[in-house]
Amino acid sequence: DSSLKQVSVRYDVAELIIWNCNTNCKVIVQCKGFIGMTDLCIWDDQIILQAECRNMPWSDVIRSQDAFLQSLCKAYPYSSQWDERRLEDGVVVLSVLLTNHIRFRLYCQRIDVATCGEHANSN
């Protein structure tokens, strides 16, 4: 079992701090090149039932039925690039289901994970 302890967003980095009860270890998940987040509701429960990470190439992003990704494509219809970030490089979607049955998603360019003092590993 794991519990969500903290969620923070600093411009283009979202960070989740998770406590893994099985290993008694803190897990830090950093979503870099952060694009956005949906449906976060941690009012009554922070226990994580399921988490999955999916890399989506640009061709999948533009065909996706995901409402957030559809809005993103509408916002950038002629160019999928701004600053140094390129949507053509794809989007990473981290989906987390809590025990209150609310699933929230983070959208970013890269996810790094560090556990128990380890350095972050990119995904």
What are these regions (language model features)?
Residues D1-N123:
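Surface-exposed, interaction-prone regions used to assemble/regulate multi-protein complexes
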